[in-house]
Design a protein with these regions (language model features):
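Short, acidic, metal-binding catalytic loop of nucleotide-sugar glycosyltransferases
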Residues: 1-8
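A conserved acidic beta->alpha catalytic loop
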Residues: 15-24, 41, 63
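Acidic helix N-cap motif at the loop->helix transition within catalytic regions
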Residues: 20-28, 67, 71
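Glycine-rich, basic loop-to-helix element that forms the pyrophosphate-binding segment
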Residues: 38-54, 75
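Conserved nucleotide-sugar donor-binding catalytic segment
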Residues: 52, 69, 109-200, 211
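Short aromatic/hydrophobic "clamp" motif used to bind/position activated sugar donors
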Residues: 59
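The conserved acidic donor/metal-binding loop of glycosyltransferases
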Residues: 63-67, 92
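Conserved donor NDP-sugar-binding/catalytic core segment of glycosyltransferases
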Residues: 71-103
Length: 214
């Protein structure tokens, strides 16, 4: 993050009860852009606190074990300023693991997601740790992360789309997404699957209601 070509940003780091040397390492940096917040095991609340504490017009999301392309913030900010209607800008990513395996992720669509609610019924095309979000839209529509374990991002995109937000996927690999045996997509696979089913039911009911009210 500190190697970004775009340098004018604040760096909020929310430590969610780490047990390694994370805090010690962060405190070793003297960069004034860094702000460390320590909250133990309050994941959803921590996500929302990050949204509230961020003072900028745009919020870029990132997970601790992934790697950000040095041009990511510059490219996303340029895209969103050039197209001010965009609410959420995700990117393509490259998946890697500690075993050295690597593959591209380019099946997440690209450009503006037309009929976003209908598309979200099919799958979640926005990679959470790759996003940049327009904060003003969230404030104006009172949108925040909800308690949807393992699919809180999926729910957020749905709420944004319902409010008329524009979802966009930048067709560049601006994130290195780490795959490991300890991440949520592996350790809570069943919970994530059930959460996705729950949310798809909610989306389907919304679409049926909208259709019946025409």
């Amino acid at each position: 993050v500190l190697n970004q070509t775009l340098t004018d940003f604040e760096f909020l780091i929310i430590d969610d009860g780490s047990t390694d040397r994370t805090v010690e390492i962060i405190q070793g940096y003297t960069d004034k852009r860094i702000r460390l917040i320590r909250k133990e095991h309050q994941f959803i609340q921590n996500l929302n606190e990050g949204l509230e504490l961020a003072s900028g017009s745009y919020i870029a999301r990132m997970d601790a074990d992934d790697i950000m392309h040095t041009e990511r913030l510059r490219i996303q900010l340029k895209r969103m300023k050039k197209n001010p209607d965009i609410t959420v800008c995700g990117t393509w990513a490259k998946i890697f693991s500690d075993k050295g395996n690597e593959r591209n992720v380019s099946h997440l669509g690209y450009g503006i997601i037309h009929e976003p609610i209908l598309e979200l019924l099919k799958y979640n095309m926005i990679l959470h740790p790759s996003v940049m979000i327009k904060k003003e839209f969230l404030l104006n529509h009172h949108i925040k992360y909800q308690n949807y374990p393992c699919v809180e991002d999926y729910k957020l995109w749905f709420d944004i789309a319902k409010a008329g937000g524009i979802l966009f996927v930048e067709p560049q690999e601006l994130l290195m997404f780490r795959r490991s045996d300890t991440q949520v997509t592996v350790t809570k696979k069943e919970e994530m699957s059930l959460g996705s089913i729950r949310l798809r039911k909610e989306i389907l009911l919304y679409l049926l209601s909208a259709y019946n009210n025409k």
